Regions:
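Nucleotide-activated chemistry modules centered on ATP-dependent adenylation/adenylyltransferase
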Residues: 1-117
Length: 117
């Protein structure tokens, strides 16, 4: 998604195009790589998932592999923000854990925004 490009090179258009070219050449055009969410923010992807009733309780993002999610790694922060911006609690968290996760996410984003000013 859009927020990952600077951090992860496999989220760039260039990577997708190169991978797609290799796939097309290697499979005689039988396999194509699509990346429909490249221009979307995570909260936009979350909104679409909510509209399609994606079972988010069955999805996992935490880089530390924790269950419930750690709420501290970068992907958890983005996931928390995505659900928060959509006015929905991430089903991976209890009500109490969600309050703490949102508070931490807001602190992290505030600190980040202060650094980039």
């Amino acid at each position: 998604h859009k927020g990952d490009r600077a951090q992860y090179k496999d989220c760039t258009y260039e990577f997708t195009q190169a991978f797609n070219l290799a796939s097309v050449l290697g499979t005689k055009n039988e396999v194509r790589i699509e990346s429909p969410f490249n221009d979307w923010f995570k909260w936009d992807i979350c909104k679409t998932g909510l509209n399609y009733s994606v079972p988010f309780e069955s999805t996992h993002s935490c880089y530390l592999g924790q269950e419930p999610p750690c709420g501290r790694c970068s992907t958890d922060i983005e996931r928390i923000e995505a659900f928060y911006r959509n006015g929905v609690k991430d089903p991976k968290y209890s009500d109490e854990e969600w309050k703490k996760a949102v508070k931490h996410m807001q602190e992290v984003l505030k600190e980040f925004n202060n650094r980039v000013k």
